[in-house]
Amino acid sequence: MNKHSGNRTAIDPAALEMSIASATEALLAYRHADGHWAFELEADSTIPSEYILLRHYLAEPIDVVLEAKIGNYLRRTQGAHGGWPLVHDGPFDMSASVKSYFALKMIGDSVDAAHMVKAREAIRARGGAANSNVLTRFLLALYGVVSWRAVPVLPIEIVLLPIWSPFHLYKISYWARTTIVPLMVLAVLKPRAKNPKGVGIEELFLQDTKSVGMNPKAPHQSWGWFLLFRGIDGILRVIEPHLPKKLRERAIASALAFTEERLNGEDGMGAIYPSMANIVMMYDALGKDDHFPPRAIARRAIDKLLVIGEEEAYCQPCLSPVWDTALTCHALQEVGGANAVAKAKQGLDWLKPRQVLDVKGDWAVKAPNIRPGGWPFQYNNAHYPDLDDTAVVVMAMDRAQRHAGSKEYATAIARGREWIEGMQSRDGGWAAFDVNNLEYYLNNLPFADHGALLDPPTEDVTARCVSMLAQVGEFTQRSKAVAEGIAYLRRTQHAEGSWYGRWGLNYIYGTWSVLCALNAAGIDHQDPMIRKAVEWLVSIQSWDGGWGEDAISYRLDYSGYEQAPSTSSQTAWALLGLMAAGEVEHPAVARGVNYLKNAQTENGLWDEQRYTATGFPRVFYLRYHGYSKFFPLWALARYRNLRSTNV
């Protein structure tokens, strides 16, 4: 008898099977005709606000219906505090509030309307729009609201620096790189938004807008580095206007070449909104009209991010079909049965040709001898494949071909494995898109007030890569990569037993990821780091049997897990983590399973309004609409499968 069996909450097997069947049927209903899944990916109010402001920047014809729907979305997401949060029911955020107010005013909302008065008072009570972050300030500078003295100098000549330079573009993350290159062109040309309505937001400032200076030091920044870089910024501000014209022209040409090589068709450069928007504004500033092919392509890419409903609309930051499809395939394979397995195989068949095999992207600058073999997060993003997605896809393919007794995906698996092994950073961990992106001093640049300029190794991505390598046959005894990955995870565990989650919120996500990796790598379930993690997960279970965690757990003055209302996805992660640690019979697992069963709606799925994923900690969060559909199903099916072999 298991040590926990006498203290177990009863789970009715028939009811559990009904829950699994209902969730499976509902999940399959979201499948596209070609076999893949793509769910909505919602951020905060900033992206839809920026979309409105982009249209008016370019003086595009006003789409009254679309603007009305985006306006409805913005008004609904306004917080009780008067401003806009970064997450559902979250605290006031200055930059989100300034952009949302600006967009609503641009749409035509009266400044005397109750919601606008409330927003304006909330912004002014917190020091006014001068306290916006650096990217918001760039937008305001482009609109002429603040002067260019309010933003850091971004000399376009940076693109010509040699690779050994401490400020080379390949020393920052892909998302920063693809955003900054067109932004540098804008910073040099200093264009002015067309803004045919002449809308401004001077009323959000407590001082003359033209007197707004540079941002103060951000909390994550070191005084020494900050003062050094602020001094360099001051010097550049003096000399930048006097740099040789020919050098500037060559730098702009280099930036354009960089952009056009990575334009990525109608999926957009980097396949993320900020890059696409900056590219469109860059071409406009260079005098290219809206029929100029690269500009037109980039502009169409942006509209593919829109989600337009009956009453509301918003703009997504990017699309997530590879991630959604791969994780759905995992859930369906866990469910089992002929239909679910067949649909998972069709999803994997959709994924297979999307592997990047012939493009050496930006990652190859630091790993020139590695063959490509990764998958991107989006439909197409060949220059920027994602290690997390690649690991998840390879694991799903490996499981499928083992079940089928075939070698159908063997070549794809081998190339994915080879690429991931070659992308291991020197500290033993893996990052999301780059290798050895460890120049932490760059987060002290005036531009980096967000603290997200880099893509260093993280516990969650490292765990996924270790899981994949172990699943395909690499173990600590004979694999240097896995041994170093395990060592990285061992030393990054927090004292209370958790691991940080960079791309999911937060310590629940990181701990689930690592426990799965340790299990796959054959680490003894009695290992102290596993026992500490189990004890921690059990200790934070909510009264209702679920698990929930708040985004404020990312605060710099870390003091531990921050409880929030239970969510289906975070509960599923906790359950999958505990089961990976051999705790399927633990009473906490049964309580968590009961929570998921009780929270399941009549349509077979789970309602989850809270944000449980992370774009940039403390700056930008995500709500994957698919998370509440496939993760709970995965956990319930895993519980059923383990219990059926453990009674």
From Swiss-Prot:
Gene Ontology CC terms: lipid droplet
PFTB repeats: 67-108, 413-454, 530-577
Disulfide bonds: none
GO molecular function: lyase activity; squalene-hopene cyclase activity
EC number: 4.2.1.129, 5.4.99.17
Family: Belongs to the terpene cyclase/mutase family.
Protein name, as recorded: Probable squalene--hopene cyclase
Species of provenance: Sinorhizobium fredii (strain NBRC 101917 / NGR234)
Gene: shc
